[in-house]
Amino acid sequence: SEAIGEKRQVRLVDYASSHSGVVRDRLVEPFDFTTDYNQVWCYDLEDGRNKLFKTMRIGRVEVLQEGWMAEMKHVKGFVDVFRFSGPERYRVKMELDVRARNFMVECFPLAEREMTMVEDGKWLLDTVVCGLMGVQSFELTVAGAKIVESERINN
């Protein structure tokens, strides 16, 4: 957060990327955190793109003397309740029993605002997600959670 406030570049040392499967340093301009501080929005100076970096995958942070060079390109994207971002959008409805609902809210607190109780002990999550990986993983690993509808939304 020091680098954000001072508008300085940082080196994310030993960042472990699930996307590439590689652990390496990243030269970035951090400009904001997600709501839960699990991820940081950065402008990646190598790729010339805005990206989310998960804080738990960063070995350490080196704050550099260099100031931001690409501030006009800093743009936050959409992040779904499962903490995924990307260009794909799906409207998803998932039925949850009490146990699944509680687990979802504990793991993904932002999902709570998109849930409604439909009957005693039954909840419906109605949300937009960036791809289906997060919601399908939840359905496969948590008893009492079932996707009842998913539809791709045009961007």
What are these regions (language model features)?
Residues 1-93, 98:
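Core beta-strand-centered patch of the WYL/Sm-like small regulatory domain
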Residues 80-155:
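Polybasic (Lys/Arg-rich)
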